[in-house]
């Protein structure tokens, strides 16, 4: 863990690399040119872009590919516990030493990249050396000038739910949902397979508008359904009906992402039987995840449950609320959030959900909101709220012999901190 923190600190404190976000493909393309275009060695690239659901959709596709006895590299962001998690090489994660060596090579090129661009180059350099069938690449914010938009002929581009996240990255005069959709959809390849996940009708209309002249094969989410019979969910399309047997995927939103991945897997010629056998094994760390063991779980009283969810946008919040409504136990929340989100809109979704809410900062994250800032927002929205200096203090304020569910939410960075402590 300390090696991971040191690598992040090395990047954050590096004079050449910028911590601020600055969208521009010129820098990364120059670096890739100097490295003799390793990105061109990546065959069967599948991009995952959008606002909510990139990781769960990518991870599900990866699980299906591996169950089919094929290999895929994967690039994700953010990592939860360790920088290594960003770089899956088909059979293992990159070692800390390999990441360090890659940074040294990039340094020598003397191109002033952003930290996310450096991480993307590290992935491309190392993925280009792997003998695998697919390369699964999660985009950062937006897509038009995102550092992952450097592959000329991707096999597929997967669009997950698009919402108001990333408005803060747009110019003030273009700070609209329509512009978010344009930045993500208007720059997709004309020579690929585009998969569009479940969207609000208003967002779907915008997507259809920007894809009207796109020559790619476009697969919309009306080609499949998530259906429920009794307490059981199923994936259904014109040819297939697949039972979604899972004990750990709790929300409708995550099940829709799983269905989206099933459609992609079927189109990759992965057999229905393999998909059915794989579904029970799929879990999403930090997404609707209960802690059943570990150091934090041991601190709790016998009748206390604790769950984590990295929800940090309005759509995520609604998804989490729909799940929490079905829980009859009293619910207590521990909330943290990054500065570039919409905390007021986010927390409004949880009205009357928690008996008490505790706000906390995120450890080692300068861009996190303070517990006082979040406390004031929650107070304004009439929550029963207290603030704490850290997660451990928040847990002490809540933990008691009362039966309850403790929900930790608001940021994947907070979830990563908690998982590391556990």
Give, region by region, the residue ranges found by the protein language model.
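ATP-dependent carboxylate-amine ligase catalytic core
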Residues: 25, 32-33, 38-43, 67-152, ...
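Nucleotide phosphate-binding/pyrophosphate-handling subdomain across enzymes
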Residues: 44, 134, 145-158, 163-165, ...
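Hydrophobic alpha-helical packing residues
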Residues: 61-66, 127, 350, 378, ...
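N-terminal leader/targeting and accessory segments in enzymes
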Residues: 1-71, 80-81, 97, 111, ...
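Active-site-proximal loop/hinge segments that shape catalytic or ion-binding/gating pockets
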Residues: 411
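Short internal beta-strands
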Residues: 75, 193-199, 334-335, 355-363
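Acidic, Mg2+-coordinating active-site environments of NTP-dependent enzymes
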Residues: 130-138, 154-277
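C-terminal helical cap/extension that packs against the catalytic core
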Residues: 200-209, 213-215, 302-306, 347-405
